[in-house]
Amino acid sequence: EASSSSDDNVCCNGCLCDRRAPPYFECVCVDTFDHCPASCNSCVCTRSNPPQCRCTDKTQGRCPVTECRS
């Protein structure tokens, strides 16, 4: 049961657009794993047009939900 206690060591298999905080969307992990590269431990929203969610080693990013096409 000590496997789900820490949220610091999770990594993303992919990122998706989660509209849980309108008028913004958040980039969140699709799946998490116990063992994975530290360079992919969260998701961020790119400044492309339209914005996309991608793996990153930085904190989560947000973009206007109106520009989220996925």
From Swiss-Prot:
Name the record gives this protein: Bowman-Birk type proteinase inhibitor A-II
Cystine bridges: 11-68, 12-29, 15-63, 17-27, 36-43, 40-55, 45-53
Entry function: These proteins inhibit trypsin and chymotrypsin, having 2 sites of interaction with trypsin. The site of interaction with chymotrypsin has not been determined but is not independent of the trypsin-reactive sites.
GO cellular component: extracellular region
Organism, as annotated: Arachis hypogaea
Keyword terms: Disulfide bond, Protease inhibitor, Serine protease inhibitor
Transmembrane segments annotated in the record for this chain: none
Stored InterPro entries: Bowman-Birk_prot_inh, Prot_inh_BBI
Upper lineage: Eukaryota, Viridiplantae, Streptophyta, Embryophyta, Tracheophyta
GO MF, one annotated term: serine-type endopeptidase inhibitor activity
Family under the similarity heading: Belongs to the Bowman-Birk serine protease inhibitor family.
Note: Four inhibitors were found that are identical except at their amino ends and that probably arise by proteolytic degradation of a single gene product.
Site keyed Reactive bond for trypsin: positions: 19-20, 47-48
Pfam families, sorted: Bowman-Birk_leg
The organism's place on the tree of life at top rank: Eukaryota
SMART domains, per the entry: BowB
SUPFAM superfamilies on file: Bowman-Birk inhibitor, BBI (SSF57247)
